[in-house]
């Protein structure tokens, strides 16, 4: 059913990806107090410069044998513009690129797939984007915990009913967030 699409999936997909945008900005500001970006490329640079393995993290869907790498291939390059400023260009996950096509060109027919973009608001992309939001929020939560509550190692209190993410090498535990 990964290809199943609906109007409800469009709403969920847009809400999830919008929330990624909303969460990423203050998270990057928490990581770098001088952060001023507001685009996915700026978030990519900020997060992956600190967490080199962020894009390689696997999120597991509980009660199913499904693993997702929601930020797979998330990387960036920089180029110097004629005005002397650095421009960050990111290679974004497929689900983010699809989200933007649905957001801006919903009824346009994809040359590649011969489908209108809204039909790509499917179960697969909703699940990938939700796993990406889970990972982003988990990293943000961990950063806040380490900064403001470093002695409280019992956080979070409630496990997620949907996802798990192992963050090895830093804490060596399974962090599970509701």
What is each of the regions a protein language model found here?
Residues 1-15:
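Charged alpha-helical initiation segments
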Residues 21-97, 104-109:
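Short non-catalytic regulatory patches outside canonical folded cores
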Residues 94, 103-116, 137-148:
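Substrate-binding/catalytic groove segments of enzymes
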Residues 11-18, 94, 121-128:
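Aromatic- and histidine-enriched alpha-helix N-cap/loop-to-helix transition segments
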Residues 118-163:
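Amphipathic, Lys/Arg-enriched alpha-helical patches that create a basic surface
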Residues 1-2, 30, 106, 140:
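Secondary-structure edge/capping motif, primarily at the C-terminal ends of alpha-helices
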Residues 158-178:
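Acidic, Ser/Thr-rich low-complexity intrinsically disordered segments
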Residues 9, 20-25, 148:
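OB-fold ssDNA-binding interfaces and closely related basic DNA-contact patches used
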């Amino acid at each position: 059913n990964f290809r199943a699409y609906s109007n409800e999936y469009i709403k969920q997909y847009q809400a999830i990806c919008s929330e990624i945008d909303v969460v990423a900005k203050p998270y990057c500001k928490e990581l770098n107090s001088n952060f001023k970006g507001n685009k996915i490329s700026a978030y990519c640079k900020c997060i992956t410069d600190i967490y080199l393995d962020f894009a390689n993290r696997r999120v597991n869907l509980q009660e199913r044998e499904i693993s997702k790498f929601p930020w797979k291939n998330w990387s960036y390059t920089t180029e110097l513009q004629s005005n002397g400023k650095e421009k960050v260009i990111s290679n974004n996950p497929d689900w983010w690129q699809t989200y933007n096509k649905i957001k801006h060109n919903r009824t346009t027919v994809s040359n590649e797939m011969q489908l209108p973009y809204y039909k790509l608001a499917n179960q697969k992309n909703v699940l990938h984007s939700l796993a990406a939001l889970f990972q982003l929020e988990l990293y943000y939560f961990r950063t806040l915990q380490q900064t403001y509550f470093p002695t409280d190692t019992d956080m979070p209190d409630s496990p997620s009913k949907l996802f798990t993410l192992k963050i090895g090498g830093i804490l060596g535990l399974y962090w599970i967030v509701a």
